C-alpha cells in the first residue's frame, strides 16, 4: 500500500508526522488532547457560545470550507479526526472531533482514505495511489523533502564557501527519470527524512559502474546515529547499462536516509557518476487523496497504483485518462511526452548505410536506411532524400579459419583443419596441429559469437536497435537513438587453453586479445573496453576519449575462464533532444583472440610427436620442454632459460634468463633466488637478500587532489625468492567482496591483484569521514622479473645518477629490474620498475624503502617507477678482506692474536671472525734487564775513560811544553857549531836522522810502563851533524 509523491509536495521535512498531508496544508503539531480542546474552543467561539470580538454573525461552514486531518498519535496509539478550516475562510459550526483510525491503519494500493467517513475508496481514472508507501520517480527537479549536503575534509560547505575549488557547486543533479551524483572528489549526500508508524523498507534502483566513486547508503535516526551498524553500507558495482536494485528494512520512527558519494580523482580521466531512480519507501501511514498522473502518463482504470507511459507519437497532460495522438504527417513525440513537436527537415544525420549479406554471386549491396524511428520530413524545403540503395560490390573473403562452400555465408573449418579464408579447409600436416583462435578482419556479417545492442539510461529510444553496423573491412558504431546512447558490441569466448604441446606448461599467459581501432569525434566521445569473467561483473580495462588515430591494443589472458569482451561507445554524456554528433563514430578493423576454446584455425603449428612411431598424433610436452626441429620430440630447455609462451618449436623457444636470475623447475619463468655475486677489483662480493624476500611496503605521501583530498600511494614489493611467485598483493576494500572471495578460495575476484610490485591508493579515514581507511585503484606495476645487476641500465630501463643520494661507501648498489606485460594508453610498452638495493648498516631488519625526491609518487612519467631500499641486509657477505688481526704482548711465554672487523663494517653474515690465537714466545724481560745493565756499565766506563784520557793528555801537553822551553834555552847558551863545507859533487853519506816520533802502539806501551820503569823522560833532539859524534 503506497501513495505516490510528486513535485514539491512529495517530500517530508525532518521529523514531520507520519500522515501524508493534503496538498498545501500542514498537519497539526500539538498533542491530541491539546488540539481537541483548542478546536472545541474555536468552534464554541464561532457558534457564539463564547464572547466574540465581532458582533457580526458568521455563516455556517459548508463542506468546501474545511478539511479533515488527524492529530498526532498519543502514547496509547490513538488519535482524533478534526476539521480544519481552509485558509481565508470564516465560518461557524465546524464538525466536532471524533476518534480516528488507529495509527497503523493504511489503505491498499490504488485506494485513499476518505476522511469524512474514514473508509478506503478507490482512486478515479487519471489518478493513482500507493497506499502506505511513497515513491519518487520524477526527477525534473529535486523533490521536496530532499536535500543536498556537500562536505569536504569533514567540513560542511555552505554558500559562504569562497574557495575556488570548493564543493559548493557539488550536488546530486536531477536528470528527468533519474538523479545523477557528483563527478568531482567532494563528498555529497542526498538526504531524505521520513517518519514511519510501522516497520517498512526503502527500495531504489541504481547504476554504479565506476569504482573511482565510493557509493554508500545508510540510515540514521533523529539523533544522527546509524540505525544498524552491522549492515553493509557499501553498494555493489553494476555492469554498464544494468540497473541494480538495493533495499533495506526500516524501523518505525524517524529514519534519515543517506545516499552518499565520494569521487576519487587521481588522474585526468573523468569518473562516471552514480545514477539513482525509483526510490520507494514503505511504512508511512495513509494518504488522504489520490494523485493525478504526471504529464506524459495516463490511468484509464479506477483503483490504479501507477500511471502508464504514453507511447511514441502521443502525449498527455496532467491527470489524463488517455493519451492524445500527434499529427502523423507533421508532428512527433517520444515516449512519455507532454506535447508534440514539429518534424524537422531531413538531413545527412538522419540516415546511415549498411552492407547486405553476400548473395550467391559473392556480391554485397550498399543500403541506406533512415534512422528509426524516423522523425524528419522529406517534403520540406531544404530536406534531403535518401540516397539510392543497391550498389553492388564484391564481398570480402571469409575470415581466417572460415570457408565458403558455394553459398552466401561462411562456415567454420572442421576440427583439425585450417584455412586462410580464401581457400577450402585443409587438414594440418603430420607433426602439426591447428592454431586455434579467432581472427575477425572482414565484416560482411556479424560473427556468431558476437552481438550488438544499444541502451540509454534515461530513455528507451534505442532499445532493440543495433549498436554497431558491419562495413566490409571494419565494423563501426551505429546511429542509435540519442547522442548519449551506449552502443554495445560483445564478444563471447567460453575459455582459453594453450596448444597441445604446451598443455603441461605453467606459464601465466594463456592467450591474448588484440584489436585495431580508431575514433572520429567532434565532442567528448569515449570508447570503453571492458571484460566480464564468468558472468560476474564487468570491469573497465581501458578507455579512450576524443579522436584517436588508428592503433592496436592488446589484453593478456592469465586464466582459463568464460570471458565476455565488451566495447561500449558513447558520443557524449549529455542528453539532448536534437542530434548533434551523429557523425562521431568508432571503427574496429580487426579483433584477434589466440588460444580460444572452440576457436578456428587459420594456420598450423608444429607439435610434439609420440616416440612410438613417426607421424603419430600430437602429445603434450612436459613443462619446460621445447620441440626439437629434427625429431619433433620434446627436449628440456637448457639451464638458466625459460620457455616462450608464444611458440615452443626449436631451441630458440628457450629464452635466456636475465643477469643474476635462474629458471624455476618448469622453465616457465626466471627469478632471483636472492643470491647475487659480483667481482670488484679482484674481490668477490656475495649478497644474500633472503631476509628481504618477504613483501616490503611503502606508504608514500601524502598527496592532495585539486580540491585538497588527502591520499597516499601504497606500494608492495616482492623482491626475490619464492620460486618466482608474485607475493605482493594489493586490494580494493570498498566492499567486503574481496574478503569473502579470498575466504572461499575463488579465483574470480577482481578486487585483488598479485605482482612483484603493485600500488594502491589509500584514502585515510579522516580525509573523507569514513570509519576506516579505504584502498582503491590497485594496479600492477611489475609482473615479470628481468634481471639483477650492479649496472644502472638493463633493457631500456635506466636509473639516472641523480635519482637518489650518492652512497657513502664503496660498496656498489644492486639493482633489481622488473616490467609489466600490460600496456596502457599512456604506457604503450607497459610499466617498468627498478629497485636499488643499498648497503646501510644503520638500517637493521627490513630497512627503509624510499622514492626519488624529484618524483614523490615513485615515478616521473607514470610508466617507470624507482625505489631505493636501504638495509643492512643489502650489504655483501663478510669475507677475509673485512677484518684484520691485532697481536698482543708476550706474557709469561705466551702471545695472543685478536681479529676485529674493519671500521666501518660494510658486510653482514658470511664468515665469522676467527677465534683469538695463542702462541708461545720467549720473554724479553730478563734480556731487557741485562741489556740495560750492560748499557749502563758501558756508558759509565766510557765516561771514565774519557775523563782519564783527557787528564793524561793535559799532563803530557804540560811536560812537552816544558821540555820545549828547556831545549830552547840551552841552544841559546852554546857556541855556534862549526860546519864543514861540502864540496860540489860530494855526497853526505854519513848523514843519520833519528826520529823523535813514536808509533801508536809505542805510545800505549809507554803510557803503561812509564811510571814503573822509567822515571825520566828522554827526548831526542834533532841536531846538526858534527864531526866529533
Swiss-Prot record:
Domain spans labelled MRH: 672-877
SMART domains noted in UniProt: Ephrin_rec_like
Molecular functions per Gene Ontology: BMP receptor binding
Subcellular location: Cell membrane
Top-level division of the source organism's lineage: Eukaryota
Membrane topology category: Single-pass type I membrane protein
Cytoplasmic side: 951-1029
Gene Ontology biological process: negative regulation of nervous system development; positive regulation of BMP signaling pathway; positive regulation of epidermis development
Keywords assigned by UniProt, alphabetized: Cell membrane, Disulfide bond, Glycoprotein, Membrane, Phosphoprotein, Signal, Transmembrane, Transmembrane helix
Glycosylated residue positions: 169, 405, 691
Spans traversing the lipid bilayer: 930-950
Primary residence: membrane
GO CC list: membrane; plasma membrane
Signal sequence residues: 1-47
Disulfide bonds: 293-310, 323-346, 326-358, 674-720, 730-758, 827-863, 839-875
SUPFAM superfamilies recorded: Growth factor receptor domain, Mannose 6-phosphate receptor domain
InterPro entries, per database record: Elapor1-like_3rd, Elapor1/2, Elapor1/2_C, Elapor1/2_GBD, Elapor1/2_MRH, Elapor1/2_TNFR-like, Growth_fac_rcpt_cys_sf, Man6P_isomerase_rcpt-bd_dom_sf
PTM annotation (Phosphoserine): residues: 1018
Stretches in topological domain Extracellular: 48-929
Function of the protein: Functions as a regulator of the BMP signaling pathway and may be involved in epidermal differentiation.
Family: Belongs to the ELAPOR family.
Record-given protein name: Endosome/lysosome-associated apoptosis and autophagy regulator family member 2
Organism of origin: Homo sapiens
Gene name linked to the record: ELAPOR2
